[in-house]
From Swiss-Prot:
Highest taxon of the lineage: Eukaryota
Protein name stated in the entry: MinK-related peptide, potassium channel accessory subunit protein 4
Pfam family, one: MPS-4
InterPro entries (UniProt xref): MPS4
Biological processes per GO annotation: regulation of potassium ion transport
Molecular function GO labels: potassium channel regulator activity
Higher taxonomy: Eukaryota, Metazoa, Ecdysozoa, Nematoda, Chromadorea
Tissue specificity field: Expressed in the nervous system.
Amino acid sequence: MTFPKENINNYASSSFNYKYLIEEFLQWSSSCNRISYPTKYFDFLLVIIMTFVFLCLVYLLIWIEVLLNSSRPDPKHRVYYPRTNFWQRTD
């Protein structure tokens, strides 16, 4: 929150000189508002890259979970059919 310059004296106290600190803060905050175009572009790319990495990690975790939870059926429940040349489940 920035204070208007005409209201600086309203926030000043008699015990300490806050006017100087408020003026310094106003000067610093006004200089921070000037962000260059490459900085904005870099921030945008950073957000895109972080989103992509996050989605890849989520996909990887889901894929690992699917692989770990997919178990083959017991050999008792599988029968080999010679004419089709592959195993089929009976249950």
